């Protein structure tokens, strides 16, 4: 993976997973590169410890892009901000928020989020040993409709 570019990995994934014409696949790849803000580095190798390549945030956005190529309505992400500095983590969450605002359902696990990252989420579900112990619809999302914050505890 270190020697392939985001454009190449998106094209490869599109060829494997999409039943579209070559032109439609190419257009999907170009749109995805633009949507993910990867225009500047679309032809840069991903890289690794030994090969200089994408930054951590660019690499994270490219990995999300591999899943987005099929235009799923639901996206599951496990720790999408792990290993990123706070600014890059916020940038990744802003991308996910934009996707959610455009109708995509995003489910993500985040362990020990900063208050800045925590504030980006619309809904929170806290689980312990597989049981829901706390659920909240954030005040920010519905405050204009409800005029109050809401939360529900489960026992």
Describe the function of each predicted region.
Residues 125, 129-134:
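Conserved switch/coupling elements of ABC/ABC-like ATPase nucleotide-binding domains
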Residues 11, 26-45:
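Conserved ABC ATPase "signature" region
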Residues 86-87:
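Helix N-cap at the start of a conserved alpha-helix in ABC-type nucleotide-binding domains
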Residues 64-65, 92:
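Hydrophobic anchor residue at the start of the ABC signature
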Residues 68-74:
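A short, proline-enriched helix->beta-strand linker immediately N-terminal to the Walker B motif
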Residues 4, 46, 54, 67-68:
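ABC ATPase signature
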Residues 2-19, 28:
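Q-loop/switch helix immediately C-terminal to the Walker
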Residues 75-79:
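Catalytic Walker B motif of ABC-type/P-loop ATPase nucleotide-binding domains
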């Amino acid at each position: 993976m270190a020697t392939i570019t985001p454009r190449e990995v998106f094209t490869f994934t599109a060829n494997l997973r999409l039943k579209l014409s070559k032109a439609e696949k190419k257009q999907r790849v170009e749109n995805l590169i633009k949507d993910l803000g990867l225009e500047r580095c679309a032809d840069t190798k991903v890289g690794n410890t030994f090969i200089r390549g994408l930054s951590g945030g660019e690499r994270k956005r490219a990995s999300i892009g591999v899943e987005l190529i099929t235009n799923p309505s639901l996206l599951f992400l496990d720790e999408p901000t792990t290993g990123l500095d706070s600014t890059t983590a916020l940038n990744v969450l802003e991308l996910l928020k934009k996707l959610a605002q455009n109708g995509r359902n995003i489910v993500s696990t985040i362990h020990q989020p900063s208050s800045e990252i925590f504030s980006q989420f619309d809904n929170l579900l806290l689980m312990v040993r597989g049981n829901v112990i706390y659920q909240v619809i954030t005040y920010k999302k519905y405050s204009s409709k409800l005029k109050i914050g809401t939360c529900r505890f489960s026992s």
